[in-house]
Regions:
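Short carbohydrate-recognition loop motifs
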Residues: 55-79
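Extracellular beta-strand ligand-recognition surfaces/modules
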Residues: 100-103, 116-118, 140-183
């Protein structure tokens, strides 16, 4: 392959330095991209006296060759006469990456001392750093010029020198994949044993491995282990092995040999191993700013990914464990051990940072599992301690050696770190130290399940599991796997977690069962994956049940296994949503606020879902994406745009975030209240972010009683010319529905409309617009055209809207009689003449209704003032009450999460528009929810007869009763009062 051909390939493809040869490992590299991979000789590199340079195939990390340097006298050095394209700032102000030096170095044997890397301009040193040796195999680093090096880097540096350790007379090292200067994400440089000064102030949990390693265990050691102690440790290990092997499929020996051969494993004359270079997938990001965008894909295509090898290792370990033939067992074991040696040699050893290790968890899952199965074989091969230390390093388990300072932990830690940490401790020899380490592990898991404050991860008192600063079921399920498995593994041993933490986990699982549609997440709770595919995992409930009840009184917790329909109404303050159940029906109502984002969008996910929580109301779980109109999410009030214009413009807005969009409102009023556990109300002040249509505002409310929901809207305004504002009633995929033979309109007024699921909408003061047919849309991840047959209905408000409003009620069939009623047009007409509710208020300050069947009155009090004849005055709140004889049940909620006080913290540009900012960079993001108050005055004299644990004070004056509720976390406060006098 000629240089010209390679140059043209780079020029035309604008990407790849990888060869097309089937046997290639990572590829030849064209210097035009800025990486030195030594495929065509030593190039511009020179060596001092008493040292020798060459290229070698003995060891390689990028391409098939590396630079090998041998010296036999102190003071030796290498000189790279290369332009160093350092810049003090990224030319793209949207980028948060910094100029960094990137390299890989291989040491065939352990050398003492440190290398010194010096960067020069016109022969004068500008900056330098030292890099410790003391290892065998590959090591890599990202070193930021301005943050991590000593001295002052300069534009125009033109030479790099690498000095041998001062006191080492002779040695040999290999170098590869050197990038003199490139922009790397400022957040993710990883410190390690060789270069602990790199990004040393980082707090990111993936990157603090060096700090965790240094910690000392704070639990006193027993003098001697009892038989019970040893049995407990054996029980945990046996359960661990059961977990990791129950679904693992063994390989045939033929397949295992093919896998082994694919890694090109061989041994050099000096005994060192060589084979196909292995990369953690995120290392591919190293090349992004070199116009090489597909490095990750190439690693995958060439079979070079860490995750792939780790997955193979688990299945090979299972194959060895289950093999009955001694010869086959021996060969599976040999294959496993050689691949493990290769992985260690590739830099996956204790103390190695590899440049970056951010979000390492998924790739390393089975790095930890297979060794537990193969512990005896590793011990026989003399690899057990080295492997255990690598497990301990990469899992960051050292963090657990000291008691946690605050409750909770990231749900990702349950998902991606917990099993690795447990395996790392299980791999230790059975000593008092291991027992104490197991106690520390149990303490850490227990602490992780404790309730946390504000938006800190992850378990909340309302049953939510918070990730990315909002309730996030899709991440919760992954975390539940680790959490449930851990509780089961430790159950009924001396390491069992506490009753309260066990209960918190159970509550979160039961909450998920409550808010899911037959196991499927509501659209508004699908995070950045609104594809209708996210589900709870039944195995979580089954395994946690086997762990027994939280209080230990039951060997099996059967309540987790019940399949009876869920009942009642619940609000989820940390999701800004309400779930209402009646019969088999579930309604999900969702909003957003100045604390909780409207939608999460990434460059490759949820491009069109910005309206997901614009006051949405989902009545069934039958979502289909093909042809879905993203402008018409049921319940929402939003501007209708061409689908191409709906696509989010995803930016990297600050150093606290990546390329993502998570827009906030500037309004705090968004949330719900429940009444007697069976009905509920939800209200919000909608104000879309200025990034798109900041002129859109509305006040929206929903009042749910049995199989009916009353929906009110007022103060709707928008000035986006040419983009009509619609309040969507429904949108349903109809290709799977039997042919509809009836008209959706019940009358000529078009104020009663029925959909394909026999849901009936009664509209007041407006007509419903209904369409049915093939819809074209765009896929939320790929932008590819999609189509499908849908029906939808909406109320149109116009494009330039002022003081818009709506009122409608939805009737949802909950049994066969309801379905028959929904298809009786005469009955529907009669029903519409005396609907089972009355609107009490529908203005800027208050939305309120009375449900005739239950007698319950419900209000969204947006502004302080009078409410009705009973509630003389109230501060902003969601309120519901019902009276039977002289007793009132009063429910109240202040939807303000109160993470900060005062006006919105938004910042504005020169035109007065809100600037897009990451939620992670807000000063209040880790604050606890503050105390909030609801003050209301009732007509008449009332005494509290049931306080239900509420913090409420009363005072009476002028034949009126004033109540002051003290609350937090947007929870419902419900009390019962008795009238003593009118």
């Amino acid at each position: 392959m000629t240089y010209l051909f390679r140059f043209l390939t780079v020029l035309l493809a604008a990407s790849v330095f990888f060869t097309l040869k089937a046997e290639a490992q990572v590829a030849d590299y064209d210097k035009v991209n800025g990486v030195l991979s030594f495929e065509n000789g030593v190039g511009s590199v020179t060596a001092s006296k008493h040292s020798v340079l060459d290229v070698s195939t003995d060891h390689n990390k990028l391409g098939e060759h590396s630079l090998v340097w041998s010296w036999n006298k102190k003071g030796a050095y290498l000189s790279f006469n290369e332009a160093v394209p350092y810049l003090p700032e990224n030319p793209d102000p949207k980028e948060t990456s910094v100029s960094s030096f990137v390299f890989w170095v291989y040491s065939p044997k352990t050398l003492e001392g440190s290398l010194k890397f010096v960067f020069l301009k016109d022969g004068k040193e500008c900056c330098h750093f030292t890099y410790g040796l003391g290892f065998q195999g590959w090591r890599g680093a990202w070193v930021a010029f301005d943050r991590d090096m000593q001295g002052i880097p300069e534009i125009g540096m033109d030479e790099i020198r690498i000095y041998a350790p001062e006191d080492v007379k002779k040695g040999c090292l290999y170098f590869d994949g050197i990038i003199p200067a490139s922009f790397q994400d400022v957040r993710y440089h990883t410190p390690d044993w060789q270069a602990p000064f790199i990004n040393e102030q980082t707090k990111i949990h993936w990157l603090v491995l060096n700090n965790s390693w240094k910690l000392k265990l704070d639990i006193p050691l027993k003098d001697k282990l009892s038989a019970s102690d040893l049995q407990d440790m054996d029980t945990v290990k046996a359960r661990f092995v059961e977990l990791i092997t129950e679904k693992a499929k063994p390989y045939t020996l033929k397949k295992a040999r093919q896998i082994y051969d694919s890694y090109d494993i061989s041994f050099n004359p000096d005994g060192t191993i060589k084979g196909k270079p292995i990369y953690f997938i995120r290392y591919g990001e190293t090349f992004l700013n070199l116009n090489i965008s597909d490095a990750k894909a190439t690693f995958q295509k060439n079979g070079q990914l860490l995750r792939t090898l780790n997955d193979h290792l688990l299945r090979i370990a299972v194959s060895a464990m289950r093999a009955e033939d001694p010869q086959k067992k021996a060969e599976f074991t040999r294959i496993y051990l050689d691949l493990t040696r290769h992985l260690l040699d590739q830099g996956f050893e204790a103390g190695s940072g590899q440049g970056t290790l951010h979000h390492l968890g998924y790739s390393m899952r089975n790095f930890y599992t297979a060794p537990v199965i193969m512990q005896e074989a590793l011990r026989d091969a003399g690899l057990d301690k080295k492997v255990q230390q690598a497990m301990e390093w990469f899992s960051g388990v050292g963090e657990i050696k000291v008691a946690p300072k605050e409750p909770g932990m990231d749900i990702d830690a349950f998902n991606t770190s917990l099993m690795g940490r447990m395996a790392s401790v299980i791999m230790l020899e059975d000593t008092p130290y291991k027992y104490a380490y197991m106690q520390a592990l149990s303490r850490w898991i227990d602490n992780g399940m404790k309730h946390t404050e504000g938006l800190r991860p992850c378990f909340k008192r309302d049953g939510s599991v918070v990730h990315h600063k909002k309730s996030y079921p899709a991440y919760a399920t992954g975390g539940f796997t680790g959490a449930v498995d851990a509780v089961w593994m430790l159950s009924k041993t001396g390491f069992a977690i506490s009753k309260q933490s066990h209960q918190n986990l159970k509550d979160a699982l039961m909450a998920m069962k409550f808010y899911c549609y037959d196991g499927y997440f509501p659209l508004a709770m699908s995070g950045r994956h609104p594809d209708g595919k996210g589900t709870l995992i039944p195995e979580h409930y089954e395994r946690l049940a086997k762990a027994g009840s939280p209080d230990g009184s039951l060997a099996v917790d059967a309540s987790l296994l019940e399949n009876a329909p869920q009942k009642g109404t619940r609000t989820f303050g940390f999701n800004c949503s309400m779930s209402h159940r009646f019969g088999h029906r579930l309604v999900t109502i969702a909003g957003h606020s100045r604390y909780l984002w409207a939608a999460e969008t990434y460059q490759n996910a949820n491009h069109y879902g910005r309206y997901l929580t614009h006051g949405s109301m989902q009545t069934n779980g039958l979502f289909r994406q093909d042809g879905w109109d993203w402008c018409h999410i049921p319940g929402t009030t939003a501007a209708v745009l061409l689908m191409e214009k709906m696509k989010s413009n995803v930016l990297n807005v600050d150093q606290y975030s990546g390329y993502e969009e998570m827009l906030l409102s500037d309004e705090w009023f968004a949330g719900g209240v429940t009444h007697k556990g069976v009905s509920g109300s939800f209200g919000m002040k909608l104000h879309e972010h200025d990034k798109y249509n900041g002129s859109l505002r509305a006040r929206k409310s929903f009042f749910a009683f049995e199989n009916r929901v009353v929906c009110l809207g007022s103060d709707i305004e928008s000035s986006l010319e040419g983009a009509p504002v619609h309040t969507t009633l429904f949108q349903n995929y109809v290709e799977d529905v039997p042919e509809i033979t009836f008209s959706p309109y019940i009358n000529d007024r078009r104020d009663i409309i029925r959909n394909c699921h026999s849901e009936v909408y009664f509209i007041q003061g407006a007509q419903a617009c209904h369409t049915k047919g093939i819809q074209q849309s765009l896929h939320e991840e790929t932008d590819k055209p999609t189509e499908g047959e849908f029906e939808k209905a909406y109320i149109e408000h116009g494009d330039i809207v002022r003081d818009g409003r709506y009122e409608y009620m939805i009737f949802m069939p909950a049994d066969n009689n309801d379905v028959m009623f929904a298809h009786d047009e005469n009955a529907l007409e009669e029903y519409s003449k005396a609907l089972p509710y009355a609107v009490l208020r529908h203005d800027t300050s208050v939305h309120g209704v009375k449900d005739h069947e239950s007698g319950t009155r419900a209000f969204a009090v947006f502004e302080e003032g009078s409410v009705d004849s009973m509630i003389v005055s109230s501060t902003p709140a969601m309120l519901m009450y019902s009276i039977e004889a002289d007793e009132m049940t009063l429910s109240a909620s202040n939807p303000d999460l109160a993470l900060y006080e005062g006006p919105s913290d938004e910042k504005f540009d020169a035109d007065g528009k809100r600037i897009e900012r990451s939620i992670y960079g807000r000063e209040w993001v880790d604050n606890p929810c503050g105390v909030t108050y609801i003050t209301l005055t009732l007509e008449g004299l009332w005494d509290i007869v049931e306080g239900n644990g509420c913090d409420v004070t009363t005072s009476q004056n002028n034949r009126q009763t004033t109540l002051v509720f003290k609350s937090r976390e947007a929870r419902t406060e419900e009390i019962k009062l008795r009238r003593t006098s009118l």
